[in-house]
């Protein structure tokens, strides 16, 4: 049995005992019941994910998958493909938005080259797991073989396992890849069965003619390849991206290890859809970090029945929204763990 299937087989339901105990404790804390709103439900959900009545999330990390896309040759992005390796080097220098926000919340940034179209210089903080020098142009042929798609998911699982083995107890999903909103839009359109025009946005800032071209490219690719909406591996192989597959693996790996995983923006959302088709039980381990302004993101969370924690008009990717949401997850758990109960504080309860 390969790593992907064995990981899927390990994903079970949330721990009802831990969640029930957490809810009972929430109701005994020195506050009116429900007065902390979604923080209370979030802490209870994380208790169910981790199997601990009073979970403590002290070692967060964001895994940033980087890869290139052959479909970029169709003029679907406002930026050239060489920006992908340039931004990876920026991540490694600590100068990108994800680095700043990760430092702010105390999260480690793990950068993975899963498919950048050029060779990157060795760096102690770069995980080199390159499967190909980018995907094929899916407007002309499938983005990758089914075997490569499965390998991409396996890379993500392995990265999640390595992080968790090192003590990470909260994961976030990040990515970098010019033209990856095109691949993500194709994935989302395929799995949610929505028209490409409903789930395709401007990405890095293309104009009206660029948007029309982007939608047309996606529509033609979906018509050409006919991806199976119920088979995330097929969708990934035909119209996805290597970093999208890698993030799907991160999500599956986290779920199998009972570690909460915060979903970032639109590209990470596409990865979450793929993970959910492969292992529906994995959805319970996903925390929707934020709502991107990218057009199809709302469709992702609607399909997964998840409610994002933040709505800040962000559309950068990299894991930026997810990392900010990590601090909310930590705060929710601290409320559950560190607040006194009525009995402990000597405070009278509601009559």
From Swiss-Prot:
Single biological process term from Gene Ontology: cobalamin biosynthetic process
MF annotations from Gene Ontology: nicotinate-nucleotide-dimethylbenzimidazole phosphoribosyltransferase activity
One Pfam family matching this protein: DBI_PRT
Catalytic activity: 5,6-dimethylbenzimidazole + nicotinate beta-D-ribonucleotide = alpha-ribazole 5'-phosphate + nicotinate + H(+)
Record keywords, A-Z: Cobalamin biosynthesis, Glycosyltransferase, Transferase
Active site per UniProt: 318
Similarity section: Belongs to the CobT family.
Entry protein name: Nicotinate-nucleotide--dimethylbenzimidazole phosphoribosyltransferase
Organism from which the protein derives: Chloroflexus aurantiacus (strain ATCC 29366 / DSM 635 / J-10-fl)
The encoding gene: cobT
